[in-house]
């Protein structure tokens, strides 16, 4: 037998011992890793079920007709809600059931913050009902009368009139630019023998406008341009019913 091929037992023992130590070390490392993962899972479960995971801050943006508290209640998101139980899509669905809300975007910000961004339907006017104002939205729906009479959004006030004519006017108001819409203080339906669609407008700039429901939005496009031609301090009537011109009011008319 070739002596070079003979491996003595004494030479193998240290190698076997080292291998056992290495294996034992690997087992210990894996055991520590598993215990650490288990510990983290236990901590997460405790945090998930404890008040520590509850929402700490809810920020609401874009709401005019609902208080922040109403938004939170209707969304289903409150300070007693766990951050991990909040489903943004569900909260958005809950809020879009409100007739004044056009769109909602709910964002979660780890670890405990919720942002609710609301887009309301445009307020195109307020219907005066026995001295109480009822918001009228661009989707044709009305809200409950305002409890304190304060206008959350600048828009014209008008008396209720024929439903058919109201619908026509609403369709025209939707076409107005925000700047012109905010300039209108009050709209009065004032039909004449010659024009059953006649309207009288009282503007925030102090002027009176005579116009009509038909092509109302198109006629009102001339209003900002006419304003630039009026001398300060003059009391004039702006006629947009046929063409576009101004008429200075006389002494008797000023008295009225």
UniProtKB/Swiss-Prot annotation:
Extracellular side: 52-256
Membrane topology: Single-pass type II membrane protein
Topological region Cytoplasmic: 1-30
Gene Ontology CC annotations of this record: cell division site; plasma membrane
Domain POTRA: 53-121
Regions that span the bilayer: 31-51
Pfam families in the cross-refs: FtsQ_DivIB_C (PF03799), POTRA_1 (PF08478)
InterPro entries documented for this protein: Cell_div_FtsQ/DivIB_C, DivIB, FtsQ_DivIB, POTRA, POTRA_FtsQ_type
Subcellular compartments: Cell membrane
HAMAP family tied to this protein: DivIB
Protein name per the record: Cell division protein DivIB
């Amino acid at each position: 037998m070739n002596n070079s091929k003979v491996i003595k037992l004494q030479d193998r023992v240290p190698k076997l011992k080292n291998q056992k130590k290495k294996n034992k070390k690997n087992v210990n490392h894996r055991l520590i890793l598993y215990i650490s993962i288990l510990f983290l899972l236990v901590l997460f479960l405790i945090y998930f079920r404890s008040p520590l995971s509850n929402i700490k801050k809810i920020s609401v943006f874009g709401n005019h007709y609902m208080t922040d508290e109403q938004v939170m209640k209707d969304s289903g998101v409150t300070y007693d809600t766990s951050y991990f139980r909040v489903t943004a899509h569900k909260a958005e669905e809950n809020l879009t059931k409100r007739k004044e809300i056009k769109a909602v975007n709910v964002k979660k910000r780890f670890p405990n913050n919720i942002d609710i961004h609301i887009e309301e339907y445009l307020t195109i006017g307020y219907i005066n009902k026995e001295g109480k104002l009822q918001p009228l939205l661009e989707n044709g729906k009305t809200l409950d009368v305002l409890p304190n009479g304060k206008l959350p959004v600048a828009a014209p006030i008008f008396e209720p009139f024929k439903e058919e004519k109201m619908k026509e006017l609403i369709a025209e108001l939707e076409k107005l630019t925000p700047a012109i819409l905010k300039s209108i203080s009050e709209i009065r339906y004032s039909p004449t023998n010659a024009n059953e669609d006649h309207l009288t407008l009282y503007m925030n700039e102090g002027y009176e406008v005579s116009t009509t429901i038909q092509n109302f939005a198109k006629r009102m496009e001339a209003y900002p341009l006419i304003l630039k031609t009026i001398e300060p301090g003059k009391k004039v009537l702006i006629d947009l019913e046929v063409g576009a011109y101004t008429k200075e009011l006389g002494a008797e008319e000023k008295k009225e």
